[in-house]
Amino acid sequence: MSEKPSRNVVLASVGAMVALAVAVFVLVMRLPEVVGLGSRVKLPIFHGASTWVDIMLFLLLGITAAIFLVRRDDATYAWVVGLRAVAMPLWAVNSVMGFIAAMNTWDFTGSSQSPLVVARQDPRLTAQLVLLLGVAIVLLLDWLVHEKRIHKAMTDLAFVALAAVMLSDIFLDPAKRALHPDSPVLNSGWDIKGPFFAIVAAWFACMLVGAWLVRGFVGPDVEPETLPAEK
């Protein structure tokens, strides 16, 4: 197992994360207003970008967990730890942002039901909540139940498979998009799409640096000796 990052490397990495986060903030604030929503469109766009980033992190987590199940080496498992530590909490943040964005931007005029009841009918919000429950279960198993790394990695892989099935079903079936417009960002002009893709790139880079830092500090301390049963 490699040594933990030096103080200078940590400071440089944290500085890079701060710079990337600031870049994301500036990009979000400079998004143009749109007819109807005005400046309220900024939160949904950032939520969409952050969700894209989290889906990519889940994909990397699943791939890394699968590689570890084959190789059973410390270095790969350190990346499993780092990606898990970043991707799982980010989904919780994204779930909260998604709910706030829905309540702030959807038009409930003329509905006889409360906004909460209407929002609950959106398959995308429902999927977010189901996967949020899955995140909680994965973290609880990781912290309180599983002791062997192989069991932790198998749980990660099972969660990623569940997320892939649920999200693919929603994205591929137009009938399940419910209240959510069909690709509102991708159907916009480049004054929206350009900043959106820049936000995705910067936010993804920020999360990867965070995963790398966790890998460096937490990974070496999590069962550094490969158990004989895992060989």
What residue ranges belong to the model's regions?
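Polytopic transmembrane helical bundles with strong interfacial aromatic enrichment
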Residues: 1-231
